[in-house]
Amino acid sequence: MRFFKVTIWVALLVAVLTTGCSQGSHEEQGPRPPENSSAAPERQVQQETETTSEEATAHREVPFTASPKMKGGLDGAADSIREVRFGRHEGYERAAIDFGSEGTPASRVPAWSLRSSPTGEGYARITFPGIDATSETDGTFGGFILDNFYVVRAPDGGMFVDVFATGAFRYRVIELSDPGRLVLDYRPTNADLRFPIPAQAEKTVLFEPRQGEGVISPLRVSGYSRNFEASNTIMLRASSGKVLSRRTVLSNDWSETWGYFEASIGFPAFEGQATLRVGGLSPRDGTFEGVEVPVTYGTGG
């Protein structure tokens, strides 16, 4: 009988210890990120992994700037964009572009040039003249300063990447090798943007004109899209409902990535406010899908 009681107590003690160790193990692991967090919301950008010592050294050497132009890279070092990643750091956020060469990771960064107006327009454009393919087309960063990006087929060959901010910023660009990566860091500033951020819809981004801008004839309209069969309808309508101008123009891509378009439209003088509509028709039901921006007549705005 004594042996039977001892056996029961030993069994209970083992069960308690096992349960406690199991709970302790889960607590040490900490909270787990939600499954498929990189895919929610849709087109959410892949999160950046830990910073290497090479990157940390580069950070200390490269200051943030508001320079409108910058360039670098090596001609022929890569032929494609493999991935765009997002990272949060103390005081700034990062977009990292990974490159490919003949189907494998590139070891160096290809030739690039950057154009930006950090305190004026809220985005930076990095052009890669030697890139002709991409595995990424667009994505949402969802950061406090980094907002989203688009990969666009450039009008003169190659591709460019537009990285949008939520407000004014300073930036820095760092090249990393083995594998080749170009990192773009944004640090927010307290300045106000001088121009509205370009209007964006699901399949259309309009750069010219901006919301509320004063316009005269002829008007240059430019942007990029992924509208069905690369077709973009541009229509200027007066506040009375009268159509002042209408034109259809093709972008230079739509099936592989975003395609650039530009056009010039003519129209008579008008009073008050008009609405510029740019986009395409839904292949499902024929309804309009695109952006609408208010404009006024004249050179002010």
Regions found by a protein language model. Give the residues of each.
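Bimodal "functional hotspot" detector
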Residues: 26, 36-43, 177-179, 190-203, ...
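Bacterial signal peptide processing site
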Residues: 22-24
